[in-house]
Regions:
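Active-site rim/loop-helix segments in enzyme catalytic domains that contact anionic ligands
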Residues: 1-90, 117-121
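Metal-dependent de-N-acetylase/amidase catalytic core
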Residues: 58-216
């Protein structure tokens, strides 16, 4: 539920994990608002209500070692929970993080492992499995545009500074989601503790728009 997330908005700093343990419940509300913006009514916390996997924090931090975090979960046990959901809803497509969890967050890596194992354990045959990623060419253009306006993209001087950037040759599929950009951006803004409105995400959106957020 994001209990260890970094709070980027000063006005909400009282929710930080270093304060009272209340960020998780606040982020549940953020998620509910994001799902409403996207028109999604069926979303779930893995294992809820009987099992709760806590946010593991960034790689190499102390929360990684807590026994109740997702990073420490038994992969087969967690995968069996997800496999039952797959058997229930019978999806055509499964989408998950890539093998490095996007930017290396332990919970994202674990989500990849659990999703892939669940696809093996479920009785339902999923037609396609996609790993979400960002091609280098798109990110390189984004960095160039940010430099033009005197800003930066998370401090990256070049695309090689971004560990989640994938060589274009490995990107097999591009889905045109241009019609959903407004809903997508509204959903992003719903995560108010995590994204600053004057930060690189929205600066990039203002300068590249559909070019970077319209495609999946």
């Amino acid at each position: 539920r994001g209990e260890e997330g970094e709070v980027l908005v000063p006005a909400l700093s009282h929710l930080a994990s270093t304060e009272k343990d209340q960020l998780g419940s606040h982020r549940e509300t953020e998620l509910a608002n994001a799902m409403k913006a996207l028109g999604i009514t069926d979303y779930r916390f893995l294992g809820a209500p009987s099992t709760k996997f806590r946010d593991s924090g960034m790689m190499g931090t102390e929360p990684n070692n807590r026994p109740d975090v997702f990073w420490q979960a038994d992969v087969d046990a967690a995968s069996n929970i997800l496999a039952k959901i797959i058997d229930e809803i019978k999806p055509q497509i499964l989408i998950t993080y890539d093998e490095i969890g996007g930017y290396g967050h332990p919970d994202h890596i674990q989500a990849h492992r659990v999703a892939m194992r669940a696809s093996e354990l479920s009785t339902w045959e999923i037609q396609k499995i996609y790993w979400n990623t960002m091609p280098k060419s798109v990110l390189a253009e984004g960095i160039a545009k940010m430099k033009e306006i005197g800003s930066d993209f998370f401090g990256a001087e070049s695309v090689d500074d971004l560990p989640f950037a994938k060589d274009d040759e490995f990107v097999t599929t591009l889905i045109d989601g241009g019609a959903y950009v407004d809903a997508k951006m509204a959903a992003m803004k719903a995560h108010e503790t995590q994204i600053s409105l004057d930060g690189p995400f929205f600066a990039l959106s203002n300068n590249l728009g559909l070019q970077i957020w319209g495609d999946e």
